[in-house]
Regions:
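Mobile, glycine- and charge-enriched loop segments
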Residues: 60-91
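N-terminal beta-alpha supersecondary unit
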Residues: 33, 41-62
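Charged/polar positions on well-ordered alpha helices
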Residues: 16, 20-23, 47, 57, ...
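Short beta-strand scaffold segments in enzyme catalytic cores
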Residues: 30-39, 167-169
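Zinc-dependent deaminase
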Residues: 1-22, 41, 71-77, 92-176
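Short, basic and Ser/Thr-rich N-terminal targeting/leader segments
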Residues: 27-31, 53, 162-164
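Local cysteine-cluster metal-coordination motifs and their immediate loop/turn environment
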Residues: 46, 53-57, 81-100, 119
Length: 176
């Protein structure tokens, strides 16, 4: 199933939200999320700092402020969440985002790009599908944007090497 114009708009919003965490989430990626019911935005969030709640949980809590993870108990049944990067499915400093999405009753997850981190890569999407959640991977320009957005994280997750930017200046005659 392809993305509608509204899906693309909301996924682009999630990518915009992710930028708010830039420079503060290392070693984690930057991630943004938007929760909707019947196409109406009811919650937004982004991953603010490493060790704190991930974007998906922040957005779910914004949508249902009276509850906290993992006590969502189906309160958002029928909701859709748009996420800039595949939800995590492993325990780290925080519980798996996939568990929070399932507990909240989210029925559709639209993802801009898969997570390259070996503990997550494809496993988050598979976990959601096994739970009966419809999963849509964007592809196209939004996926490319999401991959670029987390370029340094992708480099580290895939190769174990740092992302290095080298700036060099010289005069026209080749002197430094």
């Amino acid at each position: 199933m392809g993305l509608s114009a509204r899906d693309e708009e909301l996924l682009a919003r999630a990518l915009d939200l992710a930028e708010r965490g830039r420079g503060r989430t290392v070693p984690n990626p930057i991630v943004g999320a938007v929760v909707t019911i019947d196409g109406r935005v009811i919650g937004e969030g982004f991953h603010e700092r490493a060790g704190q709640d991930h974007a998906e949980v922040v957005a779910l809590q914004a949508a249902a402020p009276e509850l906290t993870a993992p006590d969502f108990d189906g309160v958002l049944r029928g909701a859709c969440i748009y996420v800039s990067l595949e939800p995590c499915s492993h325990f780290g400093r925080t519980p798996p985002c996939t568990d929070a999405l399932i507990a909240a009753g989210v029925t559709r997850v639209v993802v801009a790009a898969t997570d390259p981190f070996p503990q997550v890569s494809g496993q988050g999407l598979a976990r959601l599908r096994r739970a009966g959640v419809e999963v849509v991977l964007s592809g196209g320009h939004l996926e490319r944007r999401a991959r670029r957005q987390n370029g340094p994280f992708r480099k580290w997750a895939i190769s174990g090497l740092p992302f290095v930017t080298y700036k060099y200046a010289m005069t026209l005659d080749g002197k430094v």
